[in-house]
Amino acid sequence: EAEMAALAVELLSETVRHMGFDAEVVASWQEPDADNDERYLLLDLHGRDLGALIGRRGDTLSNLQYLLRLMVNQRLHQWKNIVVDVEQYRQRRAEHLTQLALRSADQVAKSGRPLALEPMPPNERRLVHLALRDHPSVYTESSGEGERRKIQIMPKRGGG
């Protein structure tokens, strides 16, 4: 694990420096959670003006993470999950999506009308599904294709 962490920090630091950013990489091993079935390496970038590394809805961050995983896992000939974050953006986004899901569910429960959320990547749709899976008045469905795939929050019939 130490070798992987050192290599990942080195490669990520070098990559973001070549992209024109001045950022510190903080590495830590995390225990399994809702998004990860096993221990994973979290690399959190800290610095000024790093918003461009996140990109629209985290797209740039996800692409950077994908490339780093490929580079590290190919060099070490083993696969371990690596999560790249910028100043805990992913955690803040998860909290925002959970709150959005709960507010939207309340709206659907009151109105009795379905509500479609904005298109989201698979990991974000999963957070919404998990946030509402035990809700007494609504259920969720995914619809659409590819990047246009989104969640529909539907009222349960028969009062829950």
Segments the model singles out, each with a brief description of its role:
Residues 1-160:
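RNA-contacting regions in translation and RNA-metabolism proteins
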